[in-house]
Amino acid sequence: MKPKTTYIAAAVGIGIIVLAIFYMYSADQAKNRGKIFGDNLQTIQDELKQIQVEFYSKKTMLEERTMTQEEFAEFSKIHIEKMKQILAKYDALLPPESFAKSVELFKLSTQKQLESDQYLMQWIATNDTSDKIRSDSLFQESFEDEMAALESYNKAKNSAGQN
């Protein structure tokens, strides 16, 4: 082999090695970004669950008369702010494209849950049955959106795992 051909072959070999390293690095980075996204989404969902458990616990306390309506109204203001903070956290997520739909559905579910809670608070304050009916309806829609979000998330996760 001529020296020039040897240099070209060596350069091509080095180029292939560099591309392989870059590909592996990119794949690792994508996997890391996916894990970070999944962890952040799980944290948001856990916070949301805790906020809702606390809200319904306070509602039970009100029903059992261990909390006054005024105390519940004050707590409700804090609850609404916490729910708005959760919604903002969805906006801050940077989901991989395949997970964008599930994040939209999780956020929509949370928005409907917030609306449901607000109608429930209104019903408690006014005893207007239409507020309770609207709250229940939004609660059901929120649940359905949550199930759709979970299904979408699992489909995207399974597709990503097969690649």
Annotate the PLM regions.
Residues 7-23:
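Hydrophobic membrane-insertion alpha-helices, especially the h-region
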Residues 1-7:
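Short, low-complexity patches enriched in S/T/P/G
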Residues 36-163:
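Alpha-helical segments in soluble extracytoplasmic regions
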